[in-house]
Amino acid sequence: MKVKASVKKRSEDDIIVRRKGRVYVINKKNRRHNQRQG
């Protein structure tokens, strides 16, 4: 999980989710794309 100042979709499989006030990018197929904003 990468922590970045700004998160973007890197592929079509990415899903943007808000949990507990944080923005996450989750990808089950390619887990390298997982990111958290903050």
UniProtKB/Swiss-Prot annotation:
Pfam families: Ribosomal_L36 (PF00444)
The keyword Mitochondrion belongs to this UniProt entry's keyword annotation: no
One Gene Ontology MF term: structural constituent of ribosome
A single BP term in Gene Ontology: translation
Domain of life of the source: Bacteria
Entry's Gene Ontology cellular component terms: ribonucleoprotein complex; ribosome
PROSITE patterns: RIBOSOMAL_L36 (PS00828)
InterPro entries listed in its UniProt record: Ribosomal_bL36, Ribosomal_bL36_sp, Ribosomal_LSU_bL36
Keywords associated with the record: Ribonucleoprotein, Ribosomal protein
NCBIfam families: rpmJ_bact (TIGR01022)
HAMAP family named in the record: Ribosomal_bL36 (MF_00251)
Similarity remark: Belongs to the bacterial ribosomal protein bL36 family.
Name of the protein in question: Large ribosomal subunit protein bL36
Native source species: Phytoplasma australiense
